[in-house]
Structure formats: structure tokens, C-alpha cells
């Protein structure tokens, strides 16, 4: 039955684990979303966040509903130099290259200064939504495949996605506003996206990089930058 899992403690444990997994793996997605939305006119940003995340949620639910197709993404399509390449590998490779290009472009605009950046400041609303949704698929691909392995209940997996996206919607604006107010934090976020891009490329060649190392590096960098912000606030130049 659809709701038979409600009385199963293991099902609740799976729901909590999957929700936490989706939220943690959604951190890089929130950072990317914040940077994309920042290029839109102020009046469109909140709408873009909601639409982008809602569309991303629908895409994730569609992936979960197509479990058989998702699990086949890991089947080899062809071999290059004894390296088996699957559809998942190609998606991660293209996603990693796009992230590196996007973040590098943003860093270049920031270094060139405000006048150069203003030429490309205003982005297309539809283009921003599409970017958010496509990158969310790439970010969530591994978590969806992992979810399939952690739970047999489709409803639990979908509930975890809905809860996680709800948390992301709640946090996205605060994170985005904070990044926009502090250029040094924005540069740190862009550097993190480049790191994530390289990680996706390595993953596409079956070189596994433990996510814990990446998130530790990110949180440590944020902690150091937070101390700098506090110091500068107390002792302005």
C-alpha cells in the first residue's frame, strides 16, 4: 500500500537520511542559483528563484519516477582507452565543463571591473530558469541514483526531494543576498563552483573524490572569510 511505510521505523530513517542527503548535495546548487539570479533585474530575482527551484523539483521527481531509465544511465555506451563511458559519465563531463566555463567567466567579469561587468549584467529570465533546471539535473543525478539504492519506496524518495527543495527555497534568498553584498564571498563561491566542476569531470572518468573533503574545504574557507568579515566590520578601514 502507498502509505504502509508510515508505521515502519526504517522508512522514517530512510526519509531522514535521503532528505539530509538532498539538502547537503543541494548546497552547490544554491550557490550556482544565487550567482545566476544575481544577473537578473532585482524585481525578477525572487520569481526566478521560485520558478527555477520548482522546475528543478519537477525534474528530480520525473527522474525518480523513471527509476528504470535512471539506473540504465550507468550502463557503458562505448569504450575509450579501456575506459567504459556511460550516459552518466557524459552528463557529468559536460556539466563539469559548463560549471568551469561559467564560473571562470564570472570571475573574469569581476576582475575586469564594474564597467565591463555591466555589459553582461542583465541576463535573460528564461535563460536563467533553464540554467538553474539543467544544472540541478546534473547536481542531483548522483543523489537520485543513490536514493534508488537507499530506499525501495518511491513515495519516500519523492517526499525527501520535496522537503529538500522547500528548505532550499527558504535559504536561497538569504544566501543570494549575502553573496551579492560581499564580493569576496562571491569570489569564494565562484572558486568553489570551479572545484565542483573539476570534481564532476573526475567523476565522469570514475575517479571518485570523497564529497566530505570538498565540503570540509568549502566550510573551512567560509569560516575563515566570516572571521575576515567580522574583523572588517569591527575595524573598518
From Swiss-Prot:
Gene Ontology annotations for the cellular component aspect, listed alphabetically: plasma membrane
Q: Which residues lie on this side of the membrane: Cytoplasmic?
A: 39-50, 101-124, 173-186, 231-237
Which residues span the membrane? 18-38, 51-71, 80-100, 125-145, 152-172, 187-207, 210-230
Cite the ranges annotated as topological domain Periplasmic: 1-17, 72-79, 146-151, 208-209
Which compartments does it reside in?
Cell inner membrane
- Per the record, the domain of life is Bacteria
User: What are the alphabetically sorted keywords of the record?
Assistant: Cell inner membrane, Cell membrane, Membrane, Transmembrane, Transmembrane helix
Give membrane topology per the record: Multi-pass membrane protein
| Membership in a protein family | Belongs to the UPF0053 family.
Stored PANTHER family: COILED-COIL PROTEIN (DUF2040)-RELATED, INNER MEMBRANE PROTEIN
Q: What is this protein called?
A: UPF0053 inner membrane protein YgdQ
Gene behind this protein: ygdQ
Amino acid at each position: 500500500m502507498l502509505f504502509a511505510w508510515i508505521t515502519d521505523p526504517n522508512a522514517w530513517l530512510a526519509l531522514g537520511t535521503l532528505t539530509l542527503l538532498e539538502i547537503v548535495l543541494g548546497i552547490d546548487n544554491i550557490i550556482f542559483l544565487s550567482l545566476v539570479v544575481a544577473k537578473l533585474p532585482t524585481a525578477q530575482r525572487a520569481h526566478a528563484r521560485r520558478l527555477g527551484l520548482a522546475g528543478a523539483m519537477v525534474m528530480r521527481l520525473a527522474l525518480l519516477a523513471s527509476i528504470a531509465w535512471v539506473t540504465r544511465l550507468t550502463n557503458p555506451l562505448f569504450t575509450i582507452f579501456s575506459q567504459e563511458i556511460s550516459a552518466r559519465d557524459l552528463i557529468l563531463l559536460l556539466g563539469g565543463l559548463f560549471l568551469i566555463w561559467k564560473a571562470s567567466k564570472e570571475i573574469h567579469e569581476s576582475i575586469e571591473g564594474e564597467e565591463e561587468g555591466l555589459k553582461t549584467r542583465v541576463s535573460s529570465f528564461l535563460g536563467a530558469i533553464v540554467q538553474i533546471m539543467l544544472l540541478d539535473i546534473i547536481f542531483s543525478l548522483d543523489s537520485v541514483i543513490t536514493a534508488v539504492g537507499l530506499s525501495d519506496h518511491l513515495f519516500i524518495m519523492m517526499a525527501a526531494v520535496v522537503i529538500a527543495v522547500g528548505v532550499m527555497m527558504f535559504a536561497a534568498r538569504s544566501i543570494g543576498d549575502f553573496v551579492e553584498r560581499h564580493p569576496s564571498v562571491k569570489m569564494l563561491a565562484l572558486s568553489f563552483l570551479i572545484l565542483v566542476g573539476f570534481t564532476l569531470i573526475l567523476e565522469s572518468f570514475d575517479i571518485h573524490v570523497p564529497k566530505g573533503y570538498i565540503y570540509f574545504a568549502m566550510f573551512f574557507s567560509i569560516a575563515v572569510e566570516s572571521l575576515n568579515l567580522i574583523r572588517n566590520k569591527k575595524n573598518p578601514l
